Amino acid sequence: TRNQTPDVPTAQHGVVLPAGAALTVTAQQANVSRLRARGIDVSARYAFDLGPGRLGLKLAGTWLKEHITQTTPGISSGDVISDGAYSNPHLKASLTTTYDIGQFGVALNTRFHGDGLGDANASSAEEYDDNTVPSRTYHDLSARYSFDNGHTVNFGVSNLFDTQPPYMGFGEPGIYANASVYDLVGRAYNLTWNYTF
């Protein structure tokens, strides 16, 4: 809004402003950023009888070709590249193997998180001594037994081989980073008891 009374002090500032001077400016936020992601997701499942039980296999994977956030339309220098970063590697996959015999079953889940860059937007290769983060593979093992009365007991070991997270030396908090990507706890055990009625 603009000043319509040039001879009267403004309520906001207590001073006399010339006619037409800006008193307030109303600025609205606009969501103009855009995320562009391209890649391929694949999954396959197969099960067959083996010996006294049934073996099941499930494979799922993602190949990420492009993951770019456009912060300012028309200005590519502000784009944030995430594909190839350690949090968005080009390749992620998991393989779940199950074997069931009657009321007993075991499962092994293998998770692969591909290698990546600590900073995918680094201006040059010399910006960091080592900008790479190696891949990690985790194995989770579980076993269950279902009783006739509706009770089921499950025992599991996550990160079976106690695989350690990668070291990150490029500004991340602490020497190991991002618990949403890597297992920071190490090998862990869990026991659950379920009842269905």
Predicted regions and their residues:
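Flexible, surface-exposed loop regions and adjacent strand-edge segments
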Residues: 1, 72-80, 123-128, 166-179
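Transmembrane beta-barrel architecture of outer membranes
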Residues: 90-94, 136-140, 188-190
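Non-catalytic C-terminal accessory modules of carbohydrate-active enzymes
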Residues: 114, 133-135
